[in-house]
């Protein structure tokens, strides 16, 4: 049972969109983040959860993605104007931790050809996994644009050592209903990951990049 009503979330979303689109309009697309504070959770003792869910609307349409591909997928990427790297490009990094870190920082996410996915740890070591950006596999039969949109609309909740986290759930260019739909799905999924459900939720806040925060819970 959700502790937050859709009506309450809708009101906060309306205020947030009004502020970002009318009161203080910025010259870039602001991301809307769901900020979560947990309670009664011990990251040392309790299981550190990790889970991903696909949202109905893409939170960050301009997210940067790089394809680590075989020739077929590199050709498809070029055709679609998407950055791509071949096995040879990856070999040139020579497992250099600094260069791999730089690569992980340059892109928001990675997609890799199915044929290549098993070679990634051997070619790049644990660098991408450590950054939480291990590639999503794509097969030749997958529609590449569809796969990229799937990656763009998937968010990840991962508990590390601290009891707070933030995930992008939308942007200020969305309609109110799109944003409310994304937020409700994200919250309900997060609660399903928690050991004691709502009893582990300390606070939930939404905030656009440059807007004041709105406390939902």
Curated annotation (Swiss-Prot):
PROSITE patterns: RIBOSOMAL_L1 (PS01199). Its main location: cytoplasm. Transmembrane segments: none annotated. GO terms for biological process: translation. Component of the large ribosomal subunit (LSU). Mature N.crassa ribosomes consist of a small (40S) and a large (60S) subunit. The 40S small subunit contains 1 molecule of ribosomal RNA (18S rRNA) and at least 32 different proteins. The large 60S subunit contains 3 rRNA molecules (26S, 5.8S and 5S rRNA) and at least 42 different proteins. uL1 forms part of the L1 stalk. PANTHER family: RIBOSOMAL PROTEIN L7AE FAMILY MEMBER. Component of the ribosome, a large ribonucleoprotein complex responsible for the synthesis of proteins in the cell. The small ribosomal subunit (SSU) binds messenger RNAs (mRNAs) and translates the encoded message by selecting cognate aminoacyl-transfer RNA (tRNA) molecules. The large subunit (LSU) contains the ribosomal catalytic site termed the peptidyl transferase center (PTC), which catalyzes the formation of peptide bonds, thereby polymerizing the amino acids delivered by tRNAs into a polypeptide chain. This is Large ribosomal subunit protein uL1.
